[in-house]
């Protein structure tokens, strides 16, 4: 399954059905922070909430539902979903693990930690574990935590100053 940006089949999506109460409440919370004529300012948060609702990825239907809820053309929301690396447009493992491999992390051993995680999980960057528990995201160029290098983001939470033992502990703790 993969979001394709073909919204013809989603033309009649009802955001009140496709989006959970929790997702709509999250979007409404963010809409309240912006002027009424700036609904598109909440698209990032809307997509985040929809992705969380859908166990870590965005389908065409959810992208279209967020867009309709915000009175936007679906392609606008799709462009955001496919531009930012924080969004997944195909089904992936339940837990999203992203190692930073930029210069600070690389100089502090990120390459070895990625190899360690790949061996431990039995999958490579860009793949999910066979049981669907973990998605080892493609390399992240920079996650803006150079002072804590090497680091990883797991389900949106930063973990810094990693060692192989700490990586094991983090990965073993994911359900």
Where in this protein do the model-derived segments appear?
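Signature of N-terminal electron-transfer/Fe-S-associated modules in redox systems
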Residues: 1-175
């Amino acid at each position: 399954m993969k979001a394709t940006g073909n919204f013809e089949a989603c033309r009649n999506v009802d955001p009140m059905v496709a989006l959970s109460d929790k997702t709509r409440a999250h979007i409404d919370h963010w809409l309240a922070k912006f002027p009424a004529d700036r609904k598109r300012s909440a698209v990032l948060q809307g997509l985040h909430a929809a992705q969380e609702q859908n166990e870590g990825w965005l389908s065409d239907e959810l992208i279209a539902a967020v867009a309709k809820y915000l009175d936007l053309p679906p392609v606008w929301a799709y462009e955001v979903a496919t531009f930012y690396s924080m969004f997944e447009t195909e089904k992936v493992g339940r837990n999203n693990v992203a190692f930073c491999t930029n210069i600070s992390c690389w100089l502090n051993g990120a390459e070895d930690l990625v190899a360690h995680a790949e061996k431990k999980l039995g999958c490579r960057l860009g793949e999910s574990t066979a049981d669907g528990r973990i998605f080892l995201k493609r390399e992240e160029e920079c996650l803006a935590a150079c002072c804590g290098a090497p680091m990883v983001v797991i389900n949106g939470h930063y973990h810094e100053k990693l060692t192989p033992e700490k990586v094991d502990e983090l990965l073993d703790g994911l359900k």
